[in-house]
Every structure is written in C-alpha cells, then in structure tokens.
C-alpha cells in the first residue's frame, strides 16, 4: 500500500511542481502538498490510492 507522510501539513501555499498522486476520492492531485492539504481537510478520510494520475 502506498503511503504519504502528511505530518508537516497543512501548508498555506503549495509549489507548482507536478508529481501527480491519485486519492481515494478518485481525484488526481498535482503534488504531495495539494494532496496532503486535502487529507487534512478531510480529517483523515482521504487516503492515497496510488502514485500517478487516477
């Protein structure tokens, strides 16, 4: 199972680097920062499905 450490999040701003991750909500997040901010917003219900686009 793929995991991402989101302990340093949320962050107020994310970089524009493109390293897509696919969330359990079937949405593609452009990078770890955007994904982790969404995880925090979801109170931990959002998880990583896999690396790369959904």
UniProtKB/Swiss-Prot annotation:
Glycosylated sites: 43
Cysteine disulfide links: 6-36, 14-33, 22-54
Principal subcellular localization: secreted
GO MF assignments: serine-type endopeptidase inhibitor activity
Keywords of the record: Disulfide bond, Glycoprotein, Protease inhibitor, Repeat, Secreted, Serine protease inhibitor
A cellular component annotation (GO) from this entry: extracellular region
Site entry: Reactive bond 3: 16-17
Alphabetical list of PANTHER family matching this protein: OVOMUCOID-LIKE-RELATED, SERINE PEPTIDASE INHIBITOR, KAZAL TYPE 2, TANDEM DUPLICATE 1-RELATED
Free-text comment on this protein's domains from its UniProt entry: Avian ovomucoid consists of three homologous, tandem Kazal family inhibitory domains.
Protein name: Ovomucoid
Species whose genome carries this gene: Anseranas semipalmata (Magpie goose)
């Amino acid at each position: 199972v793929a995991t991402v450490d989101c302990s340093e999040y949320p962050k107020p701003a994310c970089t524009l680097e493109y390293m897509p991750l696919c969330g359990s909500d079937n949405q593609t997040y452009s990078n770890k920062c955007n994904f982790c901010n969404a995880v925090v917003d979801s109170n931990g219900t959002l998880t990583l499905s896999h690396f790369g686009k959904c």
